[in-house]
Amino acid sequence: MATTYRIAVLAGDGIGPEITAVALDVLRAIAPRFGLDFDFVPALVGGCAIDAVGEPLPAATLATCRQSDAVLLAAIGGTQWDSLPRHLRPETGLLALRSGLGLFANLRPAKIFPQLLHASSLKPEVIAGVDLMVVRELTGGIYFGQPRGIFTTETGEQRGVNTMAYTATEIDRIGRVAFETARKRQGKLCSVDKANVLEVSQLWRDRLTALSAEYPDVELTHLYVDNAAMQLVRAPKQFDTIVTSNLFGDILSDIAAMLTGSIGMLPSASLGESGPALFEPVHGSAPDIAGQDKANPLAMVLSAAMMLRYGLNQPAAAQAIEEAITAVLDQGYRTGDLMSEGCTLVGCREMGNLLIKELSR
């Protein structure tokens, strides 16, 4: 008897519906082999929700997500909503969704596919074999700390204020996710901070060091964030799992992303302590190519694979999808963002068809 999973599907804006269709087809194709069944429940978020009901995260969408086993999100946003007040913009809907689901840990892998070594701006010998994971704290730090704002001083001068703060509980929570993630990978965890000048980073380092006693099988190291950024570009193969705060993780995960050469190959997962996790590609909604069958669906498909591995505990099914992607790339098929001499250009739908063909072998 098949195991049925209820999946909230948030196709979103721009290329979102196109890449979502491919990911769902891939999941349907692989389901019978692993005794799985999916109940896909569509819901609105972002610009399409604003157009439909006047707000970026309808209450019905949050309710649907909370009642699901996992949430699969494509992309949100577009220039037509940029002039709206901040609280009505698509991006606010995503922040509210993360908050509403209690998601505090963001996992972003950066893995180099051998077939795409040429796509990176770094030398092949520098990036060949890179396979790392950035674990970023999502709900604390300087993006959420209070007080914040732009104030006028007694002398009439404007002063901008943001507060970077973490509690020991918040640090321990993300630290445990990072140690558990590293334990399932190569057993190496690098904690990134700025403990030489920031008290909040001193606490971060102290808490991670204390936690390491519970994970003797994981090797813990520490780097200052400026050095970590340099090392990611100089010698990225030294890293396995990186854990860091919200701001530093925002920056470092984008650096790690470009090691791969294409943001169109990067999935992500956002996890909470309980309840459904959120899985989405790193790239945006790319409205300039929406509806033209030019989008690269592979980051979305890899997000579906992450959902299987981290959200539904189906690692074998996840691996099968990843192996299908490798096989299709081995055969020389590329979407436009990955195209190089000697390869065969395919569109979004055809890339999906090739994956399904590979999965049916």
UniProtKB/Swiss-Prot annotation:
GO terms for biological process: L-leucine biosynthetic process. Keywords: Amino-acid biosynthesis, Branched-chain amino acid biosynthesis, Cytoplasm, Leucine biosynthesis, Magnesium, Manganese, Metal-binding, NAD, Oxidoreductase. Binds 1 Mg(2+) or Mn(2+) ion per subunit. It is an enzyme of class 1 (oxidoreductase). This is 3-isopropylmalate dehydrogenase. SUPFAM superfamilies: Isocitrate/Isopropylmalate dehydrogenase-like. NCBIfam families: leuB. One of its GO terms (molecular function) is NAD binding. Belongs to the isocitrate and isopropylmalate dehydrogenases family. LeuB type 1 subfamily. NAD(+) binds at residues 78-91, 284-296. Homodimer. The keyword Ribonucleoprotein does not apply. GO terms for cellular component: cytosol. It is found in: Cytoplasm. Catalyzes the oxidation of 3-carboxy-2-hydroxy-4-methylpentanoate (3-isopropylmalate) to 3-carboxy-4-methyl-2-oxopentanoate. The product decarboxylates to 4-methyl-2 oxopentanoate. It catalyses: (2R,3S)-3-isopropylmalate + NAD(+) = 4-methyl-2-oxopentanoate + CO2 + NADH. Substrate binds at residues 98, 108, 136, 226. The record marks 143, 194 as: Important for catalysis. The keyword Oxidoreductase applies. Signal peptide: none annotated. Mg(2+) binds at residues 226, 250, 254. It comes from the Bacteria. It comes from Thermosynechococcus vestitus (strain NIES-2133 / IAM M-273 / BP-1). Its cofactor is Mg(2+); Mn(2+). The gene is leuB. Its EC number is 1.1.1.85. Pathway: Amino-acid biosynthesis; L-leucine biosynthesis; L-leucine from 3-methyl-2-oxobutanoate: step 3/4.
